[in-house]
């Protein structure tokens, strides 16, 4: 019988994350285990960040990302910050290189506790997102929420940050829209063969964006780091903002910079909640006082 694995329940601006220590193990977290953990109010999460031994030379760890519906995700910026905080507390290191399904990324914990993640380069070609049909210009595609003569949401910008995003621009408060109603319909629209993350964005100044996101495989979320990046690069690409913006998500602000080398940097906090152990096959778990960060962090607040 396999031994249980350690985990830490954390959050990145309210994006609920489980950081699971799968190093030195041959097994992986099953979909059934993820769904069981997601259904428990104490361990409910948006994503699991499972830390595995490295698969590629030059990287520190491979991170498998699992949504709360048991599906695999390519990227999770908020979850990556949580992984960095957990590993920094354990190892004393502050810079890491990870491999995910979306590729290689680097991340650094700063002296003030904030964490920057290099989210890589955005992609805009319709094949790379991917879309189901050719689109000449992904800055604005034909997609809308009915009624046809006065659509509630329409003409989103499309981008990939290693995962597909649609950003709908609105001219009023993002809370004015029923994202819980429109989100699942748009996520599963036929134009997105791999489904998509759906965001509503309101540009409030040349360097500030308000954002709400329906996250693919997770639903409404208080924060989605890759969506914040997709909104920031799409805003710059369409002339709505400059290349360095604050994106205000329901959980708080993220600083996003689309650098001249085309890389997108995301900076924000992470917060430790509690630790425990769990069975990666079944999802059976228990809380303990020792975990990825040890017993001395039980009252640790936001970094």
UniProtKB/Swiss-Prot annotation:
Q: What is its EC number?
A: 5.1.1.7
| One term under GO cellular component | cytosol
Positions of the record's site feature: Could be important to modulate the pK values of the two catalytic cysteine residues: 165, 215
Domain of life of the native organism = Bacteria
Any one GO BP annotation for this protein:
lysine biosynthetic process via diaminopimelate
Binding sites annotated in the UniProt record for substrate: 15, 47, 67, 77-78, 163, 197, 215-216, 225-226
Q: What is its main location?
A: cytoplasm
The UniProt keywords, alphabetically, are: Amino-acid biosynthesis, Cytoplasm, Isomerase, Lysine biosynthesis
Active-site residues, record numbering mapped to chain:
76, 224
- Annotated region (Disordered) at 278-303
Q: Which InterPro entries match?
A: DAP_epimerase_AS, DAP_epimerase_DapF
The annotated pathway is: Amino-acid biosynthesis; L-lysine biosynthesis via DAP pathway; DL-2,6-diaminopimelate from LL-2,6-diaminopimelate: step 1/1
Q: How does it assemble?
A: Homodimer.
Q: What does this protein do?
A: Catalyzes the stereoinversion of LL-2,6-diaminopimelate (L,L-DAP) to meso-diaminopimelate (meso-DAP), a precursor of L-lysine and an essential component of the bacterial peptidoglycan.
Against NCBIfam families, the record matches this protein to: DapF
The protein's name:
Diaminopimelate epimerase
From what organism does this protein derive? Brucella melitensis biotype 1 (strain ATCC 23456 / CCUG 17765 / NCTC 10094 / 16M)
Instruction: Tell me the organism's taxonomic lineage.
Output: Bacteria, Pseudomonadati, Pseudomonadota, Alphaproteobacteria, Hyphomicrobiales
């Amino acid at each position: 019988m396999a031994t249980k694995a350690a985990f830490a329940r954390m959050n990145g601006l309210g994006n609920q994350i489980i950081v699971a220590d799968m190093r030195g193990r041959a097994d992986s977290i099953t979909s059934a285990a993820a769904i069981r953990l997601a259904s428990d109010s104490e361990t409910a999460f948006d994503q699991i960040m499972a830390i595995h031994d490295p698969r590629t030379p030059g990287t520190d760890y491979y991170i498998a990302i699992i949504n709360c519906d048991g599906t695999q995700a390519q990227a999770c910026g908020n979850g990556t910050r949580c992984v960095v905080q957990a590993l920094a507390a354990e190892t004393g290191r502050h810079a890491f290189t990870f491999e995910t399904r979306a590729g290689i990324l680097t991340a650094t914990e700063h002296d003030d506790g904030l964490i920057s993640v290099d989210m890589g380069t955005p992609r805009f070609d319709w094949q790379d997102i991917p879309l189901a049909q050719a689109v000449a210009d992904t800055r604005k595609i034909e997609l809308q929420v009915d009624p046809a003569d006065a659509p509630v949401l329409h003409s989103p910008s499309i981008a990939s940050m290693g995962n597909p995003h649609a950003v709908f621009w609105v001219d009023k408060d993002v809370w004015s829209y029923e994202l819980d109603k429109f989100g699942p319909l748009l996520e599963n629209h036929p134009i997105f063969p791999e489904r998509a993350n759906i965001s509503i964005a309101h540009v409030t100044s040349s360097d500030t964006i308000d954002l709400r996101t329906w996250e693919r495989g997770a639903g409404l979320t208080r924060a989605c780091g890759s969506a914040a990046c997709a909104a920031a690069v799409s805003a710059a690409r369409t002339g709505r903002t400059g290349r360095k913006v604050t994106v205000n998500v329901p959980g708080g602000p993220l600083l996003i910079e689309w650098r001249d080398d085309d890389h997108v940097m995301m900076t924000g906090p992470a917060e430790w909640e509690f630790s425990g152990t769990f069975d990666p096959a079944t999802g059976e778990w228990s809380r303990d006082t020792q975990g990825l960060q040890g017993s001395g962090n039980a009252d640790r607040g936001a970094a």
